[in-house]
């Protein structure tokens, strides 16, 4: 759990888990888990939302629909608010939406790019090549192995080239990515490609990448657990030192496999989204819940 509590409480939760040689996991394992894996392998060029509000003149939403999932995101941080270096609000920003379908978020987008489902990795890798000034093919519009880019991804080379140039020439750019990127084919490789693209762009301008996440302090939980153990979620202390293995030490798997004999749930609600097998095991073991509401 730990998603809706303070970083100080999260730190103590890690200490308790270490003391009893237990298992600690955050809600990331059922949400932006692939992003957590990508952070571990690629790193993250990031910033605060305050910096985005005050500086960003290019805002890209990739695989998310914040108009419905985070309805205040546009108004408070990324699209319409007036900032120190964006005094005219929306007029000072270019908003790009990359999604497989036209969602409600498309209403604020200046540019809508609709790739084929499951082709995010190919598009991101093509953008990395274009940003670095590489030609994708000797023949216009084709990959090196002769596959037409638009036929493969649903996005034309002209569109990708225009986006790459906008990214390189902005003053401050931000890539917000959602679970439409992380929970489709490619998983953490998709997140890693996007994070690597943001890092590449810092050779030309200031560019950051941020996951659009749920819950109050789930990012804080990942940061605290990573700070204390070296791993962001799904950490096991049974041998007296931290071990990380998603698929074994993540909560859904621990419960579904019947490995847990007691559970302490802190500031989260696994009952609302865990699979039936995990919930059934949770019913058969002692459970302590620390939450502000029942």
Give short role names for the model-derived ranges.
Residues 1-294:
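Catalytic alpha/large subunits of respiratory electron-transfer oxidoreductases
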């Amino acid at each position: 759990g730990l998603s809706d509590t303070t970083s100080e409480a999260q730190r103590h939760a890690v200490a308790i888990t270490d003391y009893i040689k237990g298992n600690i996991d955050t809600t990331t394992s059922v949400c932006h888990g692939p992003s957590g894996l990508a952070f571990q392998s690629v790193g993250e060029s990031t910033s605060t939302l305050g910096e985005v509000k005050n500086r960003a003149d290019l805002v890209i939403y990739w695989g998310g629909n914040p108009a419905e999932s985070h309805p205040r995101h546009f108004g408070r941080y990324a699209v319409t608010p007036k900032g120190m270096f964006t005094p005219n609000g929306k007029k000072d920003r270019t908003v790009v939406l990359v999604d497989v379908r036209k969602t409600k978020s498309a209403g604020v987008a200046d540019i809508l790019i609709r790739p084929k489902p499951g082709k995010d990795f190919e598009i991101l890798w093509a953008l990395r090549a274009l940003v670095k000034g590489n030609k994708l093919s000797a023949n216009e519009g084709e990959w090196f192995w002769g596959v037409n880019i638009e036929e493969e991804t649903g996005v034309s080379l002209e569109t990708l080239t225009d986006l790459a140039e906008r990214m390189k020439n902005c003053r401050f750019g931000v890539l917000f990515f959602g679970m439409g990127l992380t929970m489709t084919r490619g998983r953490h490789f998709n997140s890693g490609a996007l994070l690597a693209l943001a890092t590449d762009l810092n050779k030309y301008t200031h560019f950051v990448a941020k996951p659009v996440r749920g819950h109050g302090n789930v990012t804080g939980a990942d940061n605290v657990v990573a700070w204390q153990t070296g791993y962001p979620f799904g950490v096991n202390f049974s041998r007296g030192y931290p071990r990380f293995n998603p698929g074994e030490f993540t909560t859904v798997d621990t419960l579904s496999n019947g490995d847990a004999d007691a559970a302490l749930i802190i500031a989260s609600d696994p009952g609302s989204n865990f699979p039936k097998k995990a919930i059934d095991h949770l019913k058969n073991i002692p459970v302590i819940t620390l939450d502000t509401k029942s």
